[in-house]
Amino acid sequence: TLDDVQGLAKDCRLSTRDAYRLLCAAACGLDEEAESEDQGMERDYFRPGIHELDPAECRADPYYQTIRLPNVQKNGWRMGYRRIEPCEAFTADNLLLLPDGREVPQLGYFLEAFDAPMVEQDGREWMTVTPSERNTMLGDIAAARGNVAVFGLGLGYYAFMVSQKPEVARVTVIERDPAVIALFREYILPQFPNRQKITLVQADAYDYAAHMQGFDTAYVDIWHDVLDGVEMYLKMKRLEPASPQTRFLYWIEPSMLAWLRGMALMEIAENETGPMLQTIGPVRDYDDLCEKLSQDGIRRIAARIPLEIARR
């Protein structure tokens, strides 16, 4: 709790970030006082992986500054805000990939309450615009150019942000669910300053991607997380050759590539030539293996990785 963090910080003359980190380590059963692997775990993962975020910076984001969601319910859907409580932990960004091979999950928290836009379907949180979504999209927002196809509407964060860019001429959003489109069209799109750039298309993402033309950038965000996204990611990678002039970008791609690398390492550890190693093919030496298991190496073979890997 906030009281725990502030109390430890005061008593031990620590920053609130260090106090939060120590409390997280203790909650995970780590003993930093003992000379053990626990100290290495805390040093190598907790320190680079826990971040005290500034709520003012998030609230200054153009989407947060512009878009106001009404608290409405319609046809099983509810739109409004979800409160992130002080010191509540949440995913803050993509995995941090370090040169020594460490993959460090990024955890964030605020010292005050924060209200994040949210849509629920039948009581299940379906779409949000949290600091995690914001941080994991920033690089792909910066990369967007020309005519942009956006697969997956959500609450329109990506479409909003790229429509603000002068180097983006048009944004076509492909969404399968007509109820999501209706909510967005009624309550959110009218607040977009550059809504004249936005076109909404109700279609299946794969069907549309197989035949689309004239796009400079395509951004794919049709999954909730890594586990349900890997198979969809691999399917969409197979469709990239149909649009050779389009640059494809994928939400949380670094984390999905890391998951695929983990599956390859598991096959190596179990001395099993499974779907990943079959796709990787012969390996000359250790350096060749490292190159093939790198982010770029796995990205290059993603279109050939069997879909069954996502069901293991």
Question: For each predicted feature, which ranges?
Answer:
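N-terminal auxiliary segments of SAM/dcSAM-dependent transferases
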Residues: 1-110
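Conserved alpha-helix/loop element of class I SAM-dependent methyltransferases that forms part
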Residues: 113-118, 131-147
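Conserved class I S-adenosyl-L-methionine
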Residues: 145-156
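Conserved acidic residues
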Residues: 146, 169, 216
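Conserved SAM-binding loop of SAM-dependent methyltransferases across substrates and taxa
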Residues: 155-167
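Conserved SAM-binding motif I beta-strand of class I
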Residues: 170-175
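S-adenosyl-L-methionine
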Residues: 177-217, 225
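C-terminal substrate-binding/active-site "lid" region of AdoMet-derived donor-dependent transferases
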Residues: 224-312
